[in-house]
Amino acid sequence: MAKKVIKMVKLQIPAGKANPAPPVGPALGQAGVNIMGFCKEFNARTSDQAGLIIPVEITVFEDRSFTFITKTPPAAVLLKKAAGIDSGSGEPNRTKVATVKRDKVREIAETKMPDLNAASVEAAMRMVEGTARSMGIVIED
């Protein structure tokens, strides 16, 4: 018989840097999960993606065991890395902060494809371009 799920926890944690301090500790402590066990496993799984923020979905079962699924980094994080900026524009309509080439947008869209509900890479590119626009990043051919 399948184990009964008692809680789902969604977090965004820097790759390879999970530790029991907030936000990880309190979120998992409430669910009764072995926090150090999660941190070690998460850090081992994401050590190759250092510098990126990784969304993770943790499923906690009745016997306090857990499984987790790591997702692809948010489009905004990938765009900031591609553009070489620390943050997006405070006024995206007025102030543009960077430019990104369309082939870089395609690369980001292909990376994000498993987590997006897009039928094609072109549709995923449009989603990424929308994120870029809202951050004040200009897309050029």
Curated annotation (Swiss-Prot):
Disulfide bridges in this chain: none
> Superkingdom of the source?
Bacteria
**What does the UniProt PTM comment say about this protein?**
One or more lysine residues are methylated.
Which GO cellular component terms, listed alphabetically, does the Swiss-Prot or TrEMBL entry include? cytosolic large ribosomal subunit
Q: Which UniProt keywords apply?
A: Methylation, Ribonucleoprotein, Ribosomal protein, RNA-binding, rRNA-binding
- Which SUPFAM superfamilies does the record associate with it? Ribosomal L11/L12e N-terminal domain, Ribosomal protein L11, C-terminal domain
Protein biosynthesis listed as a keyword: no
Any one GO BP annotation for this protein: translation
Molecular function terms from GO: large ribosomal subunit rRNA binding; structural constituent of ribosome
- Function text: Forms part of the ribosomal stalk which helps the ribosome interact with GTP-bound translation factors.
Q: Which family does it belong to?
A: Belongs to the universal ribosomal protein uL11 family.
What does the subunit section of this Swiss-Prot or TrEMBL entry state?
Part of the ribosomal stalk of the 50S ribosomal subunit. Interacts with L10 and the large rRNA to form the base of the stalk. L10 forms an elongated spine to which L12 dimers bind in a sequential fashion forming a multimeric L10(L12)X complex.
Name it.
Large ribosomal subunit protein uL11
What organism is recorded for this protein?
Shouchella clausii (strain KSM-K16)
